[in-house]
Every structure is written in C-alpha cells, then in structure tokens.
C-alpha cells in the first residue's frame, strides 16, 4: 500500500516506460479518444428526439454519477499501476485478468469497423474536390436519354451513398464482391493509422495537436456560417425547446446513460494505457473532470452547429415544397407567373379551397410544415453521409464546405483510433509474450496488418450490413460488463482504502465523500440497471435490419428484413464472447491454484522422512 508520504514501490518496476512529452499531449490524446464521431452524429439526434433541452437533465445526471466516477477510476489505476488494461487487472488480481483481455478484444473488434467508417469519410473527402459535387445530380441512364431510375426515385445524395459508394446488395446473404475503390481507401486508412501509432505515444503525441484541435476549428467555422443562414434560428429552437413530459419515458434515461458511457470511451482500455504513461504524481482527479466536461461541452457545441445547418436545410426544403405547390396552382388556374408568393400561398389556397374545392383536390399538393422537415434528422452514418451532406449541397461554395466537413470527420475518427489501437498494442507489450528483440515498429505493423486483413469483409457490397452488426453487438453489453467488473475489482478486490491511499499519494488529496459514495454504490447500481435494460431491449427487439432494395414497393424507404439464422448466431457470439474471458480466466486461475496446491501437498509428502520402525 502506498502511503502519502512514502516512496512509490511501483515506480522502479518500469523505469524505461515512455512518458508524455508534456501534459497537453496527454490531455489532447484523451480528449481525442473520447470526442469521436458519436459526439457529432449521435448526441444531436438523441437531444432532439428526447425532448430537446429536457434531455440534458438525465444526460448531466448520468455524467455526474456514472461517467466521471468511472472515468476517474480508469485514469487512476492506469497511472498508479503503470500498465495497460491486461497488466492492470492481472496486478490487482490474477482472477481479474479476463477483464483486461475482454477490453483488449473489444478494442480490436471496434478498431476493425471504426476504421471502415474512416474509409467512407475518406472517399467522400476525396470526391469533395470536384465542382459540382458528384452527388449533386443523377447520372444518365444507359441510353443517355434520361436519368437512372433508382437515382430519380431515391434522390441524388442517397443514390451516391448506397449505389455509387457502397454498391450495396439488397440482402445480407448476398455478400457481393469487393469494391476496389473502398479497398484502396481501406489501405490508405490503415497506412495512415500505422504511421501515426508506429512509435506509440512518441508519434501520436506529435500528430494529436492537429487531429484533436482541427475539428474545433471546423465546428467554429460551420457555426459562424450556419448562424448566418436562413432557418438557423428555427433549427436551434427546435433542438432545445424542452419537453419535460418525455422524462417519464425510461428509454430517455437509458439513452442518456449509455451516451455518456460510450462517449467517454469507458472500458476500452485506451484511457488506462494513456494514463500509464503519466508521471506517477500527476493530478488524475483534475484530468478526469476536465476531460469529461470537455467531451460533454463538445457534444453540445456540435449540436448547436449541426442544427443551425439542419435548420437551413429544413427551411430550404420547406421553401421548395411551397414552390412546387405554388407552381401547381399557377398552372391549374392560369395565374400569372410569380403572382403568388410564399407568404401569400396559405391565404390563396384557403380561398381556392372555399371556391373551387374539386379542382384543388385533383392537384398533387403536398402538406408543407417546417416541423416535418426538421423531424427528418438521422443518427450515425445516415446523418453524415446523407442528411448533412444534402444540407451542405445547398450552401454557397458547397465543395469547400464538404471538404471541411469530411476533413473534420476524418481527424475526429483518426484521433479516436489512436485510443483504440493503444487499447490493443499496449497490452501486448505489457504481457511480455513477445521476444524483447522485436522492434515496436514491427509489432505495431503486424497488428495493423492483421486488422486490415480482418476488415476487408467491410469492403464487400454487403459490408455496411455487417458494420451495423458489429456496431450494435460487439461493444455494447461487453463494455457494460467490463465497467461493472472494473468498479467491483478496484473497490472490493483492490480495496477502497488502498485505492484512496494511492490517490492521496498521487494527488496529495484524499478522495471526497462524493467519489467514495459513487464508487461504492451509485455507479455500480447504474451500470447494473443499464445492463438489465439492455437485456430487456434485446429480448423485445426483432433480429432485423433495413435493406436498400430498389425493387421494394415502398422504395426509397428501406425494406425491413429478418436476419438469417446464422447471422443471428453471429450477433449473439459478438454480444457475449469477449465477456467470456472474465469467467474463463478466473476459472483457469482457480484450476491452476488448485493444481499448484495439489503438487505442493504431494511434494511435501514425498519429502517428509518416514518414521523408523522397530524390528
């Protein structure tokens, strides 16, 4: 046990362990790992679908009682024990080694599909250097006499995404072929990641200044431009208008808790690895609070930026809807051109409905409400590659804004990949399973190459379906289980008193009552509640996916299909296999200890001198 005034007995264990050049590198690395694509395309969606400003109430409650306490534990144990995820948990208890292996496994799986998202971003980024943008118009059909029917039915942006980028199949069972343009982008992405992590924190520490700070510059530029566009005020009003009644819905609280959990990248092992390179007496409490608050403020900042642009898109779509209706009225009733303005349209329509309802009823008039267009938001890739991309399309200088947007997404994803790869590479070195003569550059290259080969399946025509499966099942339940085991392991196995002594030694201040209560009671209860809620949701949800099928009668809506049986088995395996490391390693350690005791007992019996007997 480390005393506040004593020497650290662990410092000499790894004197040669690399250290950050300065504190800013460490903070930016943790922020870059935590602040990822989810801050841009998931939090704004949750905020606007769950009561606007009302969603911030459960969000910040989850931040205070779940996110920050768990984050503090990870930074503290990484800094104190100076090891990666596997080494930390083996040091705390050999029976908890499975937690580290589980975190390692999830980081590996997430790295596979996360870098695939980056290849999509890279493809759009490269195509943004064209004028006009390639998704601004439909291509001509084979006869060169009209436009491709699929594009006319779905829209230019959706067609470019689903057909010209993914070339997606209409069923997950039809794997299709490798899309070579995506394959080359995958090569470029993994090469970029390798060059950035080739020397661990020595190389990522240099790159992180750009990858972590550039997104904030672009968000600020977009915010300034967005606030000057028509409809920005309506978008922000729609986003933050509170609906307090929605707080009665338990799903809102679950989504808030899970968003905090995944947004901070808890239980991946990356933060433990980053903290292990700190000076032993660094103030990790201040770091945990600072990074967590920056992460949450970034989510809010991104939401304001995104919905200022989305308000412009909705206003633009609303205006075009009115223009189409006005044109129909002018053609039907022989009004002079430009005789009906958008402001006059409601009163003119009301008059015609009262005087000539039969003629009006025959017209293909659409119902135009600004709120309906604001409702057409999306989460995940749908926001980045379809909704927001279409919004940028209507902005003056669209190519410039597209380059900035996808450049921002690429740097966001790249800095998150640094943390994922640290969660994979650092434990491998800490386990000492490799010959000491193997250079770090070689080992890092082998890991990146294995990840690249494993991720080739995502470049198939059915690859996006598989990415959705990995995104939905590979991390969610596993990380919740690992986080719960982290709290239990530190508080009840390592010992709360010993842990508090260590923190006092590192920071010079003993953890307050708030920290101890959240670690002992609140955070474990919240994690257990999230785990049960996830199990219930999985049991209630149908094992289905939405396919892009031009032959579907309701196209361009995506057709809902059930996963084949073998795919459902894959989903179950992804959900629980990494977690099986926990009982598996504990059982193996138990058997090992039992075998050792059995050997020692028999050895003692064999060496014990036999009593002399009389004649």
From Swiss-Prot:
One Gene Ontology CC term in the entry: brush border membrane
Induction trigger: By renal osmotic stress.
Expressed in which tissues: Kidney-specific expression.
SUPFAM superfamilies: SNF-like
Protein species of origin: Rattus norvegicus
Intracellular or extracellular location(s): Apical cell membrane; Cell membrane
Glycosylation sites: 143, 167, 353
Membrane topology category: Multi-pass membrane protein
Main location (coarse class): membrane
Subunit field text: Interacts with CLTRN; this interaction regulates the trafficking of SLC6A18 to the cell membrane and its activity.
InterPro entries, per database record: B0AT3_SLC6sbd, Na/ntran_symport, Neutral_aa_SLC6, SNS_sf
Keyword Transmembrane annotated: yes
Catalyzed reactions per annotation: L-alanine(out) + chloride(out) + 2 Na(+)(out) = L-alanine(in) + chloride(in) + 2 Na(+)(in); glycine(out) + chloride(out) + 2 Na(+)(out) = glycine(in) + chloride(in) + 2 Na(+)(in); L-methionine(out) + chloride(out) + 2 Na(+)(out) = L-methionine(in) + chloride(in) + 2 Na(+)(in); L-valine(out) + chloride(out) + 2 Na(+)(out) = L-valine(in) + chloride(in) + 2 Na(+)(in)
Protein name: Sodium-dependent neutral amino acid transporter B(0)AT3
Ranges per topology, Extracellular: 48-52, 127-177, 228-255, 312-397, 464-472, 542-571
Bilayer-spanning residue ranges: 27-47, 53-73, 106-126, 178-198, 207-227, 256-276, 291-311, 398-418, 443-463, 473-493, 521-541, 572-592
Family: Belongs to the sodium:neurotransmitter symporter (SNF) (TC 2.A.22) family. SLC6A18 subfamily.
Record bears the keyword Transmembrane: yes
GO MF terms held by the record: neutral L-amino acid transmembrane transporter activity; neutral L-amino acid:sodium:chloride symporter activity
PROSITE patterns assigned: NA_NEUROTRAN_SYMP_1, NA_NEUROTRAN_SYMP_2, NA_NEUROTRAN_SYMP_3
Record keywords: Amino-acid transport, Cell membrane, Glycoprotein, Membrane, Neurotransmitter transport, Symport, Transmembrane, Transmembrane helix, Transport
